[in-house]
């Protein structure tokens, strides 16, 4: 399982070709920016064949959440490997933007080197599917399945408007962090809350949170950052708790709803708006449904995860 923890802001991922090396950020359009996010989600090709590519990567302690790395951080790392794997295993014949990513978190890896084994499950002219396994010394840590596709011709229908909230603050910075237990990954996040009560104060308001968010180091929004954002806010059930808790993610699905970048020269400092809702906490499990919008109201991504609501261990 991958984790999120107590930190929150106040309202107001035939032949063998060997290319060993140190993980480096991809040169693909989704990863041209430099900075901590691209450095710490970087992958390096170790070997490949017609149907498989194996990458080296490094799990950084800077993205820790609770007892393990942040789930959205691992999602971005896996998505980067899957995107690279599509190009490598099909020799560039299959293209398309990521449309769906599902991850099951098996074990929380400690910081250090890992491998990501990407397999081409199906290559189509329009839609391709790949799987990936994050592992260390042969032990699986996470399993992923992703679909990539070019746009299809269909009527444009939208019935999911951007919530009526105040625009982003003029100064690009986070709201006040409320709790000293805020995990390390929050240092990489800009969060300006707009929806939801203060966590861990036993609110009776709906389990709904939302706010403007982005990476602390300005970087154009792309599929990799959206994978991270899909798990970046504190869990909505935290609003109902009276004590800090943690919420390990069992599985996470992200649907990418538009091709990125949407313009030729995207603003690296632009924030997007994310809203997450929970309806049921039962037998320790809860669902979390999310939507991420661009500032012009375009839906960029939707997400859903199953997580476990847990109290922090007593010290």
What are these regions (language model features)?
Residues 1-315:
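Terminal targeting signals and extreme-terminal segments of soluble enzymes
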């Amino acid at each position: 399982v991958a984790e999120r923890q107590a930190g929150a802001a106040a309202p107001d991922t035939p032949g063998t070709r060997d290319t060993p090396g140190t993980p480096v950020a991809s040169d693909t359009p989704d990863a041209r920016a430099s900075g901590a996010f691209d450095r710490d989600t970087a992958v390096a090709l170790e070997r490949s064949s017609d149907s498989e590519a194996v990458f080296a990567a490094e799990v950084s302690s800077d993205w820790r959440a609770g007892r393990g790395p942040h789930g959205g951080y691992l999602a971005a790392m896996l998505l980067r490997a899957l995107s690279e794997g599509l190009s490598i295993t099909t020799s560039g014949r299959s293209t398309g933007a990521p449309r769906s990513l599902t991850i099951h978190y098996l074990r929380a890896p400690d910081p250090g080197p890992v491998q990501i084994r990407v397999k081409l499950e199906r290559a189509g002219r329009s839609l391709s599917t790949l799987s990936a396994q994050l592992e260390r010394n042969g032990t699986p840590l996470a399993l992923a399945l992703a679909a990539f596709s070019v746009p299809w011709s269909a009527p444009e229908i939208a019935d999911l408007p951007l919530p009526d909230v105040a625009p982003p603050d003029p100064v690009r910075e986070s709201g006040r962090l409320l709790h000293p237990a805020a995990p390390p990954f929050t240092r990489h996040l800009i969060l300006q809350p707009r929806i939801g009560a203060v966590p861990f104060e036993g609110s009776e308001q709906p389990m709904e949170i939302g706010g403007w968010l982005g990476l602390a180091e300005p970087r154009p929004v792309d599929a990799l950052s959206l994978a991270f954002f899909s798990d970046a806010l504190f869990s909505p059930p935290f609003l109902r708790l009276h004590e800090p808790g943690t919420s390990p993610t069992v599985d996470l699905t992200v649907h990418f709803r538009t091709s990125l970048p949407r313009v030729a020269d995207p603003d690296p400092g632009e924030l997007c708006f994310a809203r997450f809702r929970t309806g049921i906490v039962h037998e320790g499990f809860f669902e979390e449904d999310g939507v991420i919008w661009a500032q012009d109201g375009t839906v960029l991504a939707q997400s859903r995860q199953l997580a476990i609501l847990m109290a922090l261990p007593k010290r």
